[in-house]
From Swiss-Prot:
Pfam families: Pkinase. The lineage of its organism: Eukaryota, Metazoa, Chordata, Craniata, Vertebrata. Residues 324-431, 567-586, 911-1001 are annotated as: Disordered. The keyword Secreted does not apply. Its EC number is 2.7.11.1. ATP binds at residues 34-42, 57. It comes from Xenopus laevis. Residues 375-388, 577-586 have a biased composition (Basic and acidic residues). This is Serine/threonine-protein kinase TAO1-A.
Length: 1001
């Protein structure tokens, strides 16, 4: 439930379902207050419909801290609704009326602490074992459901009529385990609860510690340190050794059980399930041990109440017949008897008030109205007897089955009319009838004393309540700060993750954009290569066509010139017949035409070879250029990815530094807050201790003042006592004198009687004078002795109190010093753990970066290797195809960039890598420059002239043909391919084996 909701608000459906909407005043009748504490009051009542007896715990949630009270009520109701076990109090429902919650539960006879108060002695070991066994079963059930009681003690362990043990008072319980709140009753608190805010969380083993203290309480009537101030007890528990059983009469099983429950370190302490297997609770014992104990306690309660009743009746009768003087005497006697019966509890003084803050209804003080003034002795006696019945029954009780149908008015309405001679038997029967309406194990004096203690010790109880409230508030502040810092840390981490994700998305988009750009560039380049190849072919074909036309024109001119020369030669030779001349001329023409035809055919063949060779060269060069472009694009992509990964790693390192700085700042903030809260807590503890010291000194001074004021009355009483003794002595002496006189008168003659009487008179006077002197001396000695004794006693009490308060103050200082040292050690440990955690995170981050860099390097190497292998396969396939077509790799690579640029103006853009070799780090080796286009080829035909020249031209052409033959090309290509393959293999292998990051810039 949120703390901001209004107290008593039922708008939340989950909260509204916890409470019944009926009017509790109509459902329950005969409400009688039987106890109250800081939470409110406890009543027993009857269910109007079933006449069942129930206990109603009224808790107000108005006034100061109403929200906190309301949350405590809601928490307790939720807790009670969740539990259902034979060893836990039965929950019947909760109602709301006028800002008060009515928590309805079953009745029980009383608590284990009531047994100690009634019998005034410890319980037997088998009785302690039976009570402990039942409590352990209830605790095991709670702990199995991750619930913690946090206030186990004898006052919260209730007993029913059949001897069933039940756990009660879940106002301090925790629904979650582990917990870290400062709750419970000081003397029963486990060390880890006291140090909850300083050292961390605790679990159900705190109930095991409290159970061990409860065992000591049942064995020694009081828990350890009960004679100490509650705050001092807290400091003592937190830093000193665990308590043990003092007496040697207990068995080893019991001692070992208590020692195991009171292990200082929670990890060494057994769980409730493990304790159920302990021999102490498993030892055989009578099944009726608790029933017998309850019956003995009920009988003792009845006798004690009857004794009180008879004393009060006697006082009233004596007051009526003997007057005030006798009343005073009887009061003194009764006080002496009362001190003898209840002095053990009263000697605790104000130190006993703390446990009553959170105890259950069975062990809480009851509120009984004071007796009204009576007009006569009879009415006063009737009122006392009637009210006494209520007081003696003011406890958490269980109705006997055979007594369910009792009258509506259980109190007696008639009394004997004559108080001087009452029928004693009938009066006792009336008293027993009132008592037997409800069974109880609590005496009226216990209820009255708890009322007085609750009223007297409100200041100390409020101090402890304020201290608990402060500790809870500090815990809430620390938790609020931790939640705030955790939210800030989560927000910061989310922002960093978002920034990293944004950067990765941007990098992914940039990389995708780059890949698309590269794809478009490659597609564009492929189209450009296809167009350039087409233009290149057209250019060569145009040049060859022009060359062919020029060649044909040249042949025509040469043919005409040759024809004219032949005609001139024939004209010069007149001796040759004309027919023979015509035949020789025709033959020469035919030979020349045949030669020209061969020359034309050779030219066409060479042009065709040249075209095929140059196209093949162009394709190979374009393939190498495309490979270089692919390498450049892959290089750019890998460099881009490397840059992005470096930027991502730099951001991760920056984010790590930012998170580290924030974590250290948060830890410093928490530790600073913790130090401030510890300082404030220590100041409050010191202030409380000083106030407690002043209050104890003030109470002692008040006591001494009362003793001094009452000293004259005491001295008067002593003087009267001495005077009475003197009077008795005088009477004795007078009787002795008379007896002696009579004896002497009988034994002496009458003539001597006068002298004897005179002598006896003088002797009597002398002895009375001596007795008077002794009386004065006794009075003076008594006065001086009493005054001196009072001063010495008061001085001794002052010294004892000062020593006790000084010890408690030193204990507080030691406790606070220990807390400071533990806090400093905890802070150093937290800083060291944070440094280790940050260092480990940094190491993991660096390892992750290194792994990513290695993965990126492997990916880079694999990309390069696969690219080079693919390009090598493409070159090898191209060269194999070239060899099949009859082209040598060396010839294909023998084209100069000058000839290439001169013959094809548009080809200058492709000559940026003249050698066609690799880039700065990797690529394809390429042969020498290609031959120029459009120039006469080496070994080509000479211009037409003499036939010898023709023969030479043919021979040189044949040599050219041999050199460019498929066999030569194949041999050259195979050699070049082998060298190229070796170079490529060596380059890739060296790059992969080195494993180093290759630079592309």
């Amino acid at each position: 439930m949120p703390s901001t909701s209004r107290a008593g608000s039922l708008k939340d459906q989950d909260i509204a379902e916890l409470f019944f909407r009926d009017d509790p005043e109509k459902l329950f009748s005969d409400l009688r207050e039987i106890g109250h504490g800081s939470f409110g009051a406890v009543y027993f009542a009857h269910d109007a419909s079933t006449r069942e007896v129930v206990a109603i715990k009224k808790m107000s949630y108005s006034g100061k801290q109403s929200n906190e009270k309301w949350q405590d009520i809601v928490k307790e109701v939720k807790f009670l609704q969740r539990i259902k076990h034979p060893n836990s109090i039965e929950y019947k429902g909760c109602y709301l009326r006028e800002h008060t919650a009515w928590l309805v539960m079953e009745y029980c006879l009383g608590s284990a602490s009531d047994l100690l108060e009634v019998h005034k002695k410890p319980l037997q070991e088998i009785e302690i074992a039976a009570i402990t066994h039942g409590a352990l079963q209830g605790l095991a059930y709670l702990h199995s459901h991750n619930l913690i009681h946090r206030d186990i003690k004898a006052g919260n362990i209730l007993l029913t009529e059949p001897g069933q043990v039940k756990l009660a008072d879940f106002g301090s319980a925790s629904i979650a385990s582990p917990a870290n709140s400062f709750v419970g009753t000081p003397y029963w608190m486990a060390p880890e609860v006291i140090l909850a805010m300083d050292e961390g969380q605790y679990d159900g083993k705190v109930d095991v510690w409290s159970l061990g203290i409860t065992c000591i309480e049942l064995a020694e009537r009081k828990p350890p340190l009960f004679n100490m101030n509650a705050m001092s007890a807290l400091y003592h528990i937190a830093q000193n050794e665990s308590p043990t059983l003092q007496s040697n009469e207990w068995s080893d099983f019991f001692r070992n059980f208590v020692d195991s429950c009171l292990q200082k370190i929670p990890q060494d302490r057994p769980t409730s399930d493990e304790l159920l297997k302990n021999m102490f609770v498993l030892l055989e014992r009578p099944e009726t041990v608790l029933i017998d104990l309850i019956q003995r306690t009920k009988d003792a309660v009845r006798e004690l109440d009857n004794l009180q009743y008879r004393k009060m009746k006697k006082l009233l009768f004596q007051e009526a017949h003997n007057g005030p003087a006798v009343e005073t005497h009887e009061e003194e006697e009764e006080q002496e008897h009362g001190v003898g019966r209840t002095g053990t509890v009263n000697s605790i003084g104000s130190n006993q008030s703390i446990p009553s803050m959170s105890i259950s209804a069975s062990s809480q003080s009851s509120s009984v109205t004071s007796l009204p003034d009576a007009s006569d002795d009879k009415s006063e006696l009737d009122m006392m007897e009637g009210d006494h019945t209520v007081m003696s029954n003011s406890s958490v009780i269980h109705l006997k089955p055979e007594e369910e149908n009792y009258p509506e008015e259980p109190e007696p309405r008639t009394r004997p009319s004559e108080p001087h001679s009452p029928p004693q038997v009938s009066r006792h029967k009336s008293h027993y009838r009132n008592r037997e309406h409800f069974a109880t194990i609590r005496t009226a004096s216990l209820v009255t004393r708890q009322i007085q203690e609750h009223e007297q010790d409100s200041e100390l109880r409020e101090q402890m309540s304020g201290y608990k409230r402060m500790r809870r508030q500090h815990q809430k502040q620390l938790m609020a700060l931790e939640n705030k810092l955790k939210a800030e840390m989560d927000e910061h981490r989310l922002r960093l993750d978002k920034d990293l994700e944004t950067q990765r998305n941007n990098f992914s988009a940039e990389m995708e954009k780059l890949v698309k750009k590269h794809q478009a560039a490659m597609e564009k380049e492929l189209k450009s290569i296809a167009n350039d190849e087409k233009k290149f072919q057209q250019h060569i074909q145009a040049q060859q066509k022009k060359e062919l036309n020029n060649f044909l024109e040249s042949q025509k001119r040469e043919y005409k010139l040759r024809k004219e020369q032949l005609k001139e030669e024939l004209n010069e030779n007149q001796s040759t017949p004309k027919k023979e001349k015509q035949e020789w001329l025709s033959k020469q023409k035919e030979n020349f035409q045949h030669f020209q035809a061969e020359e034309e055919a050779n030219l066409l063949r060479r042009q065709r070879q040249y075209l095929d060779l140059e196209c093949r060269r162009f394709k190979r060069r374009m393939l190498l250029n495309r490979h270089n472009s692919e390498q450049d694009l892959v290089r750019e992509e890998l460099n881009k990815r490397q840059t992005q990964k470096d930027l991502e790693h730099a951001m991760l390192l920056r984010q790590h530094e930012s998170m580290q700085e924030l974590e250290f700042r948060h830890l410093n903030t928490i530790q600073k807050m913790r130090c401030e809260l510890i300082k404030l807590q220590h100041q409050t503890e010191l202030t409380n201790q000083l106030e407690y010291n002043k209050r104890r000194e003030r109470e002692l001074r008040r006591k001494h003042v009362m003793e001094v004021r009452q000293q004259p009355k005491s001295l008067k009483s002593k003087e009267l006592q001495i005077k009475k003794q003197f009077q008795d002595t005088c009477k004795i002496q007078t009787r002795q004198y008379k007896a002696l006189r009579n004896h002497l008168l009988d034994t002496t003659p009458k003539n001597e009687h006068k002298a004897v009487l005179k002598r006896l008179k003088e002797e009597q006077t002398r002895k009375l004078a001596i007795l008077a002197e002794q009386y004065d001396h006794s009075i003076n000695e008594m006065l001086s002795t009493q005054a001196l004794r009072l001063d010495e006693a008061q001085e001794a009490e002052c010294q004892v109190l000062k020593m006790q308060l000084q010890q408690e103050l030193e204990l507080l200082n030691a406790y606070q010093s220990k807390i400071k040292m533990q806090a400093e050690a905890q802070h150093e440990r937290e800083i060291h753990e944070l440094e280790q955690r940050v260092s480990l995170h940094r190491g993991l981050l660096e390892q992750k970066i290194e792994e990513e860099m290695l993965a990126l390097q492997n990916e880079r190497t694999e990309r390069i290797r696969s690219l080079l292998e693919r390009q090598a396969r493409e070159i090898e396939a191209f060269d194999s195809e070239s060899m099949r077509l009859g082209f040598s790799n060396m010839i294909l690579s023998n084209l100069s960039p000058e000839a290439f640029s001169h013959s094809y103006p548009g080809a200058s853009g492709w000559s940026h890598n003249p050698t066609g070799g690799p880039g700065p780090h990797w690529g394809h080796p390429m042969a020498g420059p290609p031959q120029a286009w459009g120039h006469p080829m080496q070994g080509g035909p000479q211009p037409w002239g003499h036939p010898s020249g023709s023969v030479q031209g043919v021979s040189r052409g044949s040599t050219m043909g041999v050199r460019n033959s498929p066999q030569a090309l194949r041999r050259t290509a195979s050699g070049g391919q082998t060298e190229q393959g070796m170079s490529r293999s060596t380059s890739v292998t060296s790059q992969i084996s080195n494993g180093s990051r290759m630079s592309y810039t």
